[in-house]
Structure formats: C-alpha cells, structure tokens
Amino acid sequence: MKQTKQKVIDAAISLFNTKGYDGTSVRDIAKRADVNVANISYYFAGKQGLLEQLITDFLEGYIHVIETSFEQREYLSAKDVMVQMVRGILRYQFDNRELTRFFYRELSLDTTLIREVMTVYFSRERYYIEQIIKQGQMKQEFKKVSFTMFMTQLKGMINMPFLYPQYISEVLHSFPSETFFLEMYTKEIEQWMERTLYKANMYYELPRAVHM
C-alpha cells in the first residue's frame, strides 16, 4: 500500500511540474503511476487532497530542517546555527528538486490553502530565524540589519535555483541539479551572510562546506 501511495505522489509531482496542476487530471496521474483511479480517491480523496498532501509533506520536512538547526542554539554560536540552517535548507530542496519547484510555483498563487500555509509554516520559519538573529546581535556576532530586507534577500537566493533551473542551465550554462553546483552555491550564500550579517570587526572563519 505504501508503495502504491508513493507511486501516486511521484507521478503527481512529475505531472504537476510539466502540465501544471489544472492541466493534470486524476486519470493522468493514475496512468503515469500505473494504478487504478480509485487508489487516488482512497489515499487522497481526489486531486485537491493530493495537492494538500504534497504541500504539507514538503513543508513538514522544510520546517524540520530549520527546527533541527534552531535546537542547536544553546551549543553553537548564532553564526554556526545560521550556516547549518542554510546548508540544511539547500540540501533538503536539492534532494527534493521537483517537489520544491512545484511548491514555489503554487506559493505564487493567492489561494486559501496558500494563505493557511503562510500562517502555519512560514510564521514558524520567521520566528526561528528572527530569534537566531536576535541572539547573534545580543552576543555581538551580528550587525543590526533590517530583518525584512535580510529575509527577502535570503529567501530569494535559497529559492532561485529550484524555481528557475532552466534559466540557470540554458542561459547561464550551469547545472543546478549537480552536487558541485550546490556546493559552490552554498559557499556563495555563506559569503553573502558574512558580508551582510556578521560583524566586520570580528574574526570568523566559516565552517568548511561539507561534500553533500
């Protein structure tokens, strides 16, 4: 049963990315997954239920990555927590590239589901990151920055490779699906945080980027 459910999820992610949610029928998903249409109704109560499952699954994993880093704040410096958090988010989205791309496309739509997502999940993300920044400022690790501007830039950098992979490959002639790209891109964001957030008069060597 778990295998059947996963086949439906994998088929839906692929089709929603290529044909769009509205352009994909339940029969399309069943055909791609090689299952009966009734299986989709049984597991997800239809296409809308499947959409909600995909979004919830993505966000539960996303928030788990952030919370795991946040829990280290008592043992690590705020700088190390931020680096760990950004690396974790990038790795999570890299490992779930198709789902990530679909999610951010849906996020651009003004729907009841997306408004609920903003309230439930992204409010938690804001809280965790804001607390880490406040901790870093209190301990003189971080500069005073506009949280709104910092988050706008950080989110843009974290999301861009997964939302526009064709642009990166076709125009910039790079390969965002390769691990090498992820490693180099992660280093670039860490260097941006060093310039933007970390106190310039404090010596700090970024943790070495691990091979992911």
Language-model regions: role of each:
Residues 57, 61, 92, 96, ...:
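Phosphate/oxyanion-binding loops and surfaces in catalytic or ligand/nucleic-acid-binding neighborhoods
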